[in-house]
């Protein structure tokens, strides 16, 4: 049987078309995976650069300026340096726990990004238990820190891990009560529904004004969860060398470094979602054109605008934890626990009871 040349070319073009479809299918599968990873990476690099520039301004000195324009590539240079550093293991420690600890801490924080809405219907997982899933996942991170401290076979590392666990337990309860108050106020635990509930009343409908006590408690508790000054007792340099990070080097030390800024970014994003109206642009006394209304604009422009508004609110809020680092002194361990158990817990519980009463009266 003789096959014509045109038939051979048609068969080849068909198989070439099928292979191209497979390649495009793989690319479209990878885009939703790598896009959030790239966005989170850039977000962390921007936070590191912002903190260094703001800290330099507060201390009246010159910040990073040689690595890239205005030193914006300094964090990338530090990460590259840590990537090629030698990875040391403690001779008498538990190497399995020592190696798993950083991965547990980073993974638990990365999973928190699943329920954060960056724009109108732009969320990886719109779950009915979104905010409580974040709290449940974030409670795994201290387990990784405790594993790192125990596996290092170092008294300073072990004390740092114990402090991290005690601090997380102490401040997670007030944080949860504040989130529960927001859920009662919004009649939902979905992050998307919480933002939509705030958008009904514009700027004055933000939970910042409806829950001012809860906002202050959430701010303090999130700083403690992120181990930022004045709550950086698990890694206090003057007392514990570097806490649970003492024995780490190379990429594992870099993972802890990244985890702290990832956690800070997650906390700031949740402040934006829970208290600052999320992706909605609500400016009082200033007329906003219809083009900025997410529901009325085109899908692509609305998505881009929502992402921009969410990130703008988040990075503006980041000035608070960054300036707090150079303003307040570190607390003692007893002061930290007393603040969490004797002050924040009763106040957050009272705030929850007030919110519940107001919701019942409004029925």
Curated annotation (Swiss-Prot):
Catalytic EC class: translocase
Segments crossing the lipid bilayer: 30-50, 104-124, 127-147, 253-273, 300-320, 336-356
Superkingdom as given in the UniProt entry: Eukaryota
One GO cellular component term: chloroplast thylakoid membrane
Keyword Cell division attached: no
Gene Ontology MF terms: NADH dehydrogenase activity; oxidoreductase activity, acting on NAD(P)H, quinone or similar compound as acceptor; quinone binding
Major location (coarse): plastid
Reaction it catalyzes: a plastoquinone + NADH + (n+1) H(+)(in) = a plastoquinol + NAD(+) + n H(+)(out); a plastoquinone + NADPH + (n+1) H(+)(in) = a plastoquinol + NADP(+) + n H(+)(out)
EC number, UniProt record: 7.1.1.-
Record localization: Plastid, Chloroplast thylakoid membrane
Keyword Thylakoid (UniProt): yes
Any one GO BP annotation for this protein: aerobic respiration
PROSITE patterns: COMPLEX1_ND1_1, COMPLEX1_ND1_2
Membrane topology, record value: Multi-pass membrane protein
Keyword set, alphabetical order: Chloroplast, Membrane, NAD, NADP, Plastid, Plastoquinone, Quinone, Thylakoid, Translocase, Transmembrane, Transmembrane helix
Role, per record: NDH shuttles electrons from NAD(P)H:plastoquinone, via FMN and iron-sulfur (Fe-S) centers, to quinones in the photosynthetic chain and possibly in a chloroplast respiratory chain. The immediate electron acceptor for the enzyme in this species is believed to be plastoquinone. Couples the redox reaction to proton translocation, and thus conserves the redox energy in a proton gradient.
Family: Belongs to the complex I subunit 1 family.
Subunit structure as annotated in this protein's UniProt entry: NDH is composed of at least 16 different subunits, 5 of which are encoded in the nucleus.
Protein name according to UniProt: NAD(P)H-quinone oxidoreductase subunit 1, chloroplastic
